Swiss-Prot record:
GO terms for biological process: tRNA threonylcarbamoyladenosine modification. It comes from Mycoplasma genitalium (strain ATCC 33530 / DSM 19775 / NCTC 10195 / G37) (Mycoplasmoides genitalium). The lineage of its organism: Bacteria, Bacillati, Mycoplasmatota, Mycoplasmoidales, Mycoplasmoidaceae. InterPro entries: ATPase_NBD, Gcp-like_dom, T6A_TsaB. It holds the Pfam family TsaD. It comes from the Bacteria. This is Uncharacterized protein MG208.
Length: 196
């Protein structure tokens, strides 16, 4: 790899899996990717695998020009880690642009669908994405069933089950990520309220 090349970095820690993907800047070709289940030590593992992937591909941190991150809803720890790493990276490397997308939208591999992430206590985060609608709600399981029946033409995606490839998911959603001008304004969406 040439150290002058430019890259995109994707980090997702939202839901039971650590996902890191490096893309070539101009072509979006996948340079490297990692997807592993994580139960504990997410902070250490995220930093370790991120550093390992950069070293393995002989990339300097300054060669990352766009940082893509999912902001939840997701676990408290996962979302905090992802947003802190993304904010810190873009503050340390001001030429790196920050992009964010909620996990509900990210879970949908195509333009339209219903996305669900369970958060326990008979509650679900739900995203409805159609030609006319793009909304996120916290709803009961009963209301989720009603929503699916009322929109039965839309495919349903649940808890990141049956994901074939996170890099394909990233590439199909890359245009949905929103640019965050000020990294300090990046805020995660949690599955549950943090304990005070």
């Amino acid at each position: 790899m040439f150290f002058l090349s430019k890259y995109k970095l994707f980090l997702d820690c939202a839901y039971k899996t650590l996902n890191i993907i490096i893309l070539e800047m101009k072509t979006n070709a996948v340079v490297d990717e990692l997807s592993i289940g994580v139960e504990q030590n997410l902070t250490e593992l995220a930093v370790y695998y991120l550093e390992t992937m950069l070293t393995k591909n002989k990339l300097k941190k300054s060669s990352i020009k766009q940082f893509y991150v999912t902001i939840g809803p997701g676990s408290f720890t996962g979302q905090r880690i992802a947003t802190i790493i993304a904010k810190s990276w873009c503050l340390l490397y001001p030429s790196c642009e920050l992009y964010a997308l909620n996990s509900l939208r990210f879970q949908i591999p195509y333009e339209h669908g219903i996305s669900k992430i369970s958060c326990g206590n008979d509650q679900n985060y739900c995203g409805l994405y159609s030609q006319t609608t793009s909304e996120i709600k916290l709803i009961s399981k009963a209301d989720f069933v009603k929503l699916c029946k009322a929109n039965n033409e839309l495919p349903m995606y649940e808890n990141f089950e049956n994901i074939e490839s996170y890099s394909k998911l990233l590439l199909s959603n890359i245009d949905h990520f929103e640019r965050i001008e000020d990294p300090l304004t990046l805020q995660p969406i949690y599955l549950k309220d943090p304990v005070n």
